[in-house]
Amino acid sequence: MTTTENSLMPDVRNGIDFKVADLSLANFGRKELDLAEYEMPGLMSLRHEYAEVQPLKGARISGSLHMTVQTAVLIETLTALGAEVRWASCNIFSTQDHAAAAVVVGPYGTPEEPKGVPVFAWKGETLEEYWWAAEQMLTWPDPDKPVNMILDDGGDATMLVLRGVQYEKAGVVPPAEVDDSAEWKVFLNLLRKRFETDKGKWTKIAKSVKGVTEETTTGVLRLYQFAAAGDLAFPAINVNDSVTKSKFDNKYGTRHSLIDGINRGTDSLIGGKNVLICGYGDVGKGCAEAAKGQGARVTITEIDPINALQALMEGFDVKRVEDVIADSDIVVTATGNKDIILLEHMKAMKDHAILGNIGHFDNEIDMAALERSGATRLNIKPQVDLWTFGDSGKSIIVLSEGRLLNLGNATGHPSFVMSNSFANQTIAQIELWTKNDDYDNEVYRLPKHLDEKVARVHVEALGGQLTKLTKDQAEYLGVDVDGPFKPDHYRY
């Protein structure tokens, strides 16, 4: 698809508005959804537990999260629990087109007569298309029944609403600065156009939203920033910091999908290579374990002495980017920060070294500087580019244009680990929707007993057998026989 005035219009069939690559892929997508359900015991147990009581009835959830097969199972779990849903992806490359088609068609529809959920997502969106889709996801067809819940990944949906509110209060959308990223310019342009055609739109939406549940580290950071500034217009639950999300999705999911992305993108041997992982949080830990398991020689960069010490105790070197970049064969950013790999670092890299990012946004690698540098770009295949510097003649291989390589070059995290994360998302949506009066406009975490509930289901699915405390043992530890077993400050 390309961005034209005509293409940025939703399709409508059988009363459902949508925009996906190809509805004829729905049958393929449905087969993969059926397989994924067997690997997602958390979501399936929630369907079994709550289907009759319909706790999300009346909820109109706008979701911004990678439109994958696993996300499709999440969407159909939300609808099974009574919610109405509209969806867009949170990354221009992460959509699996057959999954998007399957969700629109639904389990009982056909491409000619879809009976599923409105989805606005396809792999390879332009920035203009991405933000158009985000607005479609937040714009419900009946103005008297607007979105009242947001499910977010990275915070783009939340930011669109809250920045819109800020600019409506100010009476003007600020002009873009010369050095602003291309995406920020597109974002401001969308808000400026909407300010001219539908003044007050975002304020109305913010007033109708009961809460947001946020999936990622990056999105959670945005929530805390909005809250600190007094601009958070509704309660938020930080799903990312549930133990069964961050310690599983972030680490074990990445441990699986990083290698998958590098292999599909380059077919390069990893064993014996020098691999530089920037960041040693949960995502970085998963990346480092994966590379080590392949036989690579792994070096870590870190700002935090505690994380750096952990890396050293695991046998990894800890160095600065500028000191090791020239010797690195593969470089992966996993920090959640910006400006980690700059143009000067890219120019210093080995000829044909591989560069990729597994943090949520594309600003960990300074792609804008690379594009301005005069380096020539040769597209090898989708999401794999060879950039050649004219002054040295050296080239580097950049994966997914500096965006998430595990979703751009591969299919993301496996179903089982996403079952943990998405079970938390579903529980958080139920919590905010059914107990909204208990929450102020602040950022919250799910209670420990719900974290343990999610873990218990997955332990059983893997054939694990939990030991049961006796009453005396529980009293000795000062806990209930059935948990929670650890205090909130416990570090797993």
Swiss-Prot record:
Q: What Gene Ontology cellular-component terms does the record carry? A: cytosol
UniProt GO BP: L-homocysteine biosynthetic process; one-carbon metabolic process; S-adenosylmethionine cycle
UniProt: NAD(+) binding residues = 216-218, 250, 279-284, 302, 337, 358-360, 406
> Where can this protein be found?
Cytoplasm
A GO molecular function assigned to this protein is: adenosylhomocysteinase activity
- In terms of superkingdom, the source organism counts as Bacteria
**Hydrolase recorded as keyword:** yes
Binding annotation for substrate: 68, 153, 215, 245, 249
Q: Which reaction does it catalyse?
A: S-adenosyl-L-homocysteine + H2O = L-homocysteine + adenosine
Question: Under which pathway is this protein filed?
Answer: Amino-acid biosynthesis; L-homocysteine biosynthesis; L-homocysteine from S-adenosyl-L-homocysteine: step 1/1
Function (record text):
May play a key role in the regulation of the intracellular concentration of adenosylhomocysteine.
In which family does this protein belong, per the annotation?
A: Belongs to the adenosylhomocysteinase family.
Q: NCBIfam families, alphabetically? A: ahcY, PRK05476.2-3
UniProt name for this protein: Adenosylhomocysteinase
Organism of origin: Mycobacterium leprae (strain TN)
Its ancestry begins with: Bacteria, Bacillati, Actinomycetota, Actinomycetes, Mycobacteriales
Q: Which gene encodes it?
A: ahcY
